[in-house]
Amino acid sequence: MVHYKLMCFDVRGLGEVIRQLFYLGDVSFEDFRVSREEFKSLKSNLPSGQLPVLEIDGVMISQSASIGRFLARQYGYSGKTPTEEMQVDSIIDLFKDFMLTFRQFFFAVIHGYPEYEKERMKRDIVKPAIKNYFIALNKILLRSKSGFLVGDDLTWADLQIADNLSTLINIRLFAEKEPHLNVFIRKL
């Protein structure tokens, strides 16, 4: 029997959707949560020096999108057809592109940048990125007849985007004036 060990920070984050895929697939796994202090000593032993990492029978794999894609294929959440799989991958790439931009602001916050710098980043980087991200997500949802992002069933793109939008709500960067996105979150 395969042994899965998920290593990720002890917060909601890029490991959350991976956890959800394990639960949806009804697959047991070791959920190894790492504090920021513990991460310092683990970092040099990780494939890319980052978390999350999925260890499968002793083999470590990094990069949340690769892990998510693998598990989604294993448990039936990657799309029903090759075209749907490509659409799901496209939405995951949209999320990753947004996160690259958002990450700059996140690091400024956790590393204690001065308020004026965080406000500048929020105005010049984060808000325009969120606007473009929401425009793209709304277009996808408006084309959908099912309320899911792709096809008629839940995919890991739905999980990833819903988790991300929930995080944006929690940190007060989500605009309530996005009716399609709000309906989407409530659906999931």
UniProtKB/Swiss-Prot annotation:
PROSITE patterns reported for this sequence: GST_CTER (PS50405), GST_NTER (PS50404)
GO MF, one annotated term: glutathione transferase activity
Family annotation (Pfam families): GST_C_3, GST_N
Domain GST C-terminal: 81-188
Function: Conjugation of reduced glutathione to a wide number of exogenous and endogenous hydrophobic electrophiles.
CDD domains per record: GST_C_Sigma_like, GST_N_Sigma_like
Similarity comment: Belongs to the GST superfamily. Sigma family.
GO biological process, one term: glutathione metabolic process
Enzyme class: transferase
Entry-linked Gene3D superfamilies: 1.20.1050.10, Glutaredoxin (3.40.30.10)
Known EC number: 2.5.1.18
Name of the protein in its database record: Glutathione S-transferase 2
GST N-terminal domain mapped to chain residues: 2-79
Catalytic activity from the UniProt record: RX + glutathione = an S-substituted glutathione + a halide anion + H(+)
Binding residues annotated for glutathione, in chain numbering: K43, G49, Q50, L51, Q63, S64
Gene (name only): gst-2
Keywords: Transferase
Top-level division of the source organism's lineage: Eukaryota
Key word Lipoprotein present: no
Lineage, highest ranks first: Eukaryota, Metazoa, Ecdysozoa, Nematoda, Chromadorea
Native species: Caenorhabditis elegans
